[in-house]
A protein has these predicted regions:
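Acidic, metal/ion-coordinating pockets
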Residues: 1-405
Length: 405
């Protein structure tokens, strides 16, 4: 198995640009899929925050181009059932199942179920979550007062009154899309937490259990940009909860990606959980086209060229991804599986050439020397809270595996 996250749509404008994108409206010519095969990849995730950049037309065109090439993918489909279904790869040593989900998304990109008398909706397999802010009585009263003064909940209150929406749970206070919950005791610590929506967690767990019956190993791919608090390198609680549930259901590994940088590695009950392995190919600055919405949103004319737009977005290379060295660092994990369990795990550090020219920046190469040591040391630090032991040895990282309850 050689896995990749396809954070791109592949078509020739068969879909119109969506009103909102994952950041850059991501589209390239379908022939680029042939390059992915030449790289040696054979199993792909397609559920991410760019899946819906070109609407349903972009989703279905990408699916068609993948299918025409016999490329095995999971995470998007013509219906929710298709998008959430495991994809199977046959190898000489056994069958691998892949399930793809994304938490970072535009609601319009979510796939829909087939009804009795209505068609399903093309899109991605979602992992939605609920954010809760636990506060004391004084701060809860402040939220109530803000809601009253600003009338920020007026539309929601109207929908509740007319029966189109459910009442707020007791002890909770929504405020413009945020959910505040009153602590049981005044001495309870105030905190923020997130939890996966039960409907999405249940659907994914059920598919893992089915895939476990049908395959020798099951891999779950999850695309998550969300973070805990303000630290982009720390995964949110709902992602940890989700990953543990996946392993409990039978997943051999969970591969996370999304924040464009490394996050910690956890060994949970003997299974590796990569909260983010970073980028591999990251050429976001050299897309051929962007819709007028992108330019107008920056206060630029609709006929602006892509290069000028990228200069404006990065303030001529002084802000954003370009100036953050961790965006241009990653690892390529390599492991051996026996009896459905990961037995040997090696991490190959990769650099994407932060200081290269725009045309070359984002292409991967194996890191060497001090650069390799720095990447592995960074990942080791991120993984320490999980008790994971990473040993740097001859330019690669070796992970000590063991059952960790």
């Amino acid at each position: 198995m050689r896995f990749a996250n396809l954070e791109m749509t592949f078509h020739r404008c068969e879909g119109s640009p969506a009103a909102a994108s994952g950041g850059t409206w991501a589209m390239t010519d379908p022939s680029m899929l042939d390059d992915m095969r030449r790289f040696g990849f054979n199993l792909y995730n397609t559920a991410n925050n760019h899946s819906g950049d070109f609407g349903e037309g972009g989703v279905t065109a990408t699916i068609r181009h993948l299918e025409e090439r016999g490329m095995i993918f999971a995470g998007t489909g013509r219906t929710l059932e298709d998008a959430s279904r495991a994809a199977y790869l046959e190898t000489r040593h056994g069958r691998v199942a892949l399930i793809g989900v994304a938490s970072t998304l535009d609601p319009a990109a979510i796939a829909g179920s087939q009804g009795v008398d209505m068609p399903g909706r093309p899109g991605l397999n979602p992992l939605r979550f609920r954010a809760i802010h636990h506060v004391n009585a004084r701060h809860f009263a402040m939220a109530e007062e803000l809601a009253r003064v600003t009338e920020v909940n007026a539309q929601k209150d109207y929908l509740i009154a007319t029966g189109y929406s459910s009442p707020y749970p007791e002890g909770t206070m929504p405020l413009g899309g945020m959910n505040f919950e009153l602590n049981d005791l005044e001495t309870d610590p105030e905190r923020n937490e997130t939890e996966p929506l039960a409907i999405d967690l249940k659907r994914t767990v059920a598919e893992i259990r089915e895939a476990k019956r049908q395959a020798d190993i099951v891999v779950v791919s999850v695309h998550t940009h969300e973070m805990k608090g303000r630290d982009t390198m720390v995964p949110p609680e709902f992602l940890e909860t989700f990953a543990h549930a996946c392993v409990d259901a039978g997943a051999s590994a969970v591969i996370g990606h999304g924040p464009h940088q490394l996050r910690g590695l956890e060994i949970y009950k003997g299974a590796p959980v990569f909260y983010s392995i970073g980028n591999f190919i990251f050429e976001t600055e050299t897309v051929a086209r962007q819709p007028a919405d992108a330019f107008i949103g920056k206060g630029m004319p609709a006929d602006t060229k892509v290069g000028a737009y990228m200069d404006a977005r990065s303030a001529n290379g002084t802000r954003g991804y370009i100036v953050d060295p961790h965006i241009w660092e990653a690892v390529v994990p390599e492991w051996i599986v026996a009896d459905g369990k990961v037995r040997d795990l090696v991490l190959h550090p990769v650099t994407l050439g932060q200081k290269d020219s725009r045309s070359q920046r984002g292409l991967p190469r194996l890191a060497e020397g001090d650069e390799a040591k720095a990447i592995l040391s960074h990942l080791k630090d991120l993984s320490e809270p999980y008790g994971t032991k990473i040993q740097a040895e001859n330019g690669v990282g070796r992970v000590k595996l063991g059952i960790k309850e």
